[in-house]
Amino acid sequence: MKIIVTGFDPFGGEPINPALETIKSLPKTIAGAEIILVEIPTVFDKAADVLEEKMAEHLPDAVLCIGQAGGRVDLTPERIAINQDDARIPDNEGQQPIDRTIREDGQPAYFSTLPIKAMVEAIHRIGLPASVSNTAGTFVCNHLMYQALYLAEKQFPKTKAGFLHIPFLPEQVVDKPGLASMSLNDIVRGVEVAIGAIVEYRDKEDIKKGGGSTH
């Protein structure tokens, strides 16, 4: 089994991105699966171009995109990506699309095809906080998740795809009182077991366990 795992470069004035630091720390094999690590530019459209090239090169069984969600307290597999860019801040090339459709021939939204409930359960088992998220935002993270699922539908039908948001690292919140963080070691541990769940549930339906929200 081959799994592409992506991480974004720093953006929004941050000197580091925990997603990129995380993938740099991952082993090349997890639960018997070959892990293909890909750095992604935090740039609309270009992010998808890089991913599409790597998917065509490696024909992975799964794609797990990882991104920074500053302010979140836990590891959050995303349930859904929407067909809309609405950038509050510019990307790393100064683009700031507002209310733009990502793919004219794409679905209004795509659900993750990864076992998000099993991923959360696996992270909980090692004593780390995790929950299913129902919004990936409208910046480049949602953009890339949507593009990954679009590409899977249109070009790579055997590939499952999804997204995992992770908190800030401690060094990123030194001057941000009240914001949560998680150590790189814990994030990496959580990502590893989440990938293990992807491998375990490759040919199985995700577990049925309450993980929704009331608002």
From Swiss-Prot:
- The first-level EC class reads hydrolase
Q: What is its EC number?
A: 3.4.19.3
A single Gene Ontology CC annotation of this entry is: cytosol
Is Transmembrane a UniProt keyword of this protein? no
Where is it located? Cytoplasm
Tell me the active site: E78, C141, H165
- CDD domains linked to this entry: Peptidase_C15 (cd00501)
**Keyword Cytoplasm tagged:** yes
Q: Name one GO molecular function term.
A: pyroglutamyl-peptidase activity
| Gene Ontology BP terms | proteolysis
Catalysis performed (reactions): Release of an N-terminal pyroglutamyl group from a polypeptide, the second amino acid generally not being Pro
Q: What is its main location?
A: cytoplasm
Give the keywords, sorted.
Answer: Cytoplasm, Hydrolase, Protease, Thiol protease
Q: Please indicate which superkingdom the organism of origin belongs to.
A: Bacteria
List membrane-spanning regions. Answer: none
The annotated subunit structure for this chain is: Homotetramer.
> Which NCBIfam families does this one have?
PRK13197.1 (NF009676), pyro_pdase (TIGR00504)
The function of this protein is:
Removes 5-oxoproline from various penultimate amino acid residues except L-proline.
What protein family is recorded? Belongs to the peptidase C15 family.
Per its record, how is this protein called by name? Answer: Pyrrolidone-carboxylate peptidase
Tell me the name of the encoding gene.
Answer: pcp
